[in-house]
């Protein structure tokens, strides 16, 4: 099965790191810095995994997760945030109540090994 990652993070340096790790793990990667572009890419990419930053301009991660839930998303979701780690846990609970599969939360800055381990789930 081909693994496809759809990644949205407005901080390019973090998304570049995740993209490099994912490609080394043989993921096909679709990447954007804007939530609206994430929404446009969702059907085309057909992700098996999603990395979703919680705090972005234009739309936050909670709004994107609600959008994903409305579409019946079955991808494994990894929530990342540069803010309080509790924010990621709150987002994980909210996502689960909407039927989404959040497999992990990551706080920025994160280690390469943590990303590698989580993408291997």
What is the role of each PLM region?
Residues 12-30:
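Two-component/phosphorelay signaling modules centered on CheY-like receiver
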Residues 31-49:
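Acidic, metal-coordinating helix/loop segments flanking the phosphotransfer/catalytic sites
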Residues 56:
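Receiver (REC) domain active-site loop signature in two-component systems and cognate sites
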Residues 43-45, 68-74, 97:
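Conserved phosphotransfer cores of two-component systems
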Residues 33-34, 60-66:
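Acidic catalytic/metal-coordinating carboxylates
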Residues 9, 53:
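Active-site residues of response regulator receiver
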Residues 86-87, 107-119:
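C-terminal output helix
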Residues 63, 83-104:
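Alpha4 helix (beta4-alpha4-beta5 surface) of REC/receiver domains from two-component response regulators
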């Amino acid at each position: 099965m081909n693994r496809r990652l759809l990644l949205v993070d407005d901080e390019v340096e973090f998304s570049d790191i995740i993209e490099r790790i994912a490609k080394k793990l043989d993921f096909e990667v679709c990447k954007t810095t804007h939530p609206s572009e994430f929404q446009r890419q969702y059907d085309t990419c057909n992700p098996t995994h999603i990395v979703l930053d919680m705090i972005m301009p234009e739309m936050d991660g909670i709004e994107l997760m609600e959008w994903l839930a409305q579409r019946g998303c079955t991808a494994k979701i990894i929530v990342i945030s540069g803010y309080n780690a509790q924010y990621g846990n709150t987002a994980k609970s909210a996502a689960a109540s909407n039927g989404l599969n959040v497999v992990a939360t990551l706080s920025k800055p994160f280690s390469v090994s943590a990303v590698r381990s989580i993408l291997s789930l």
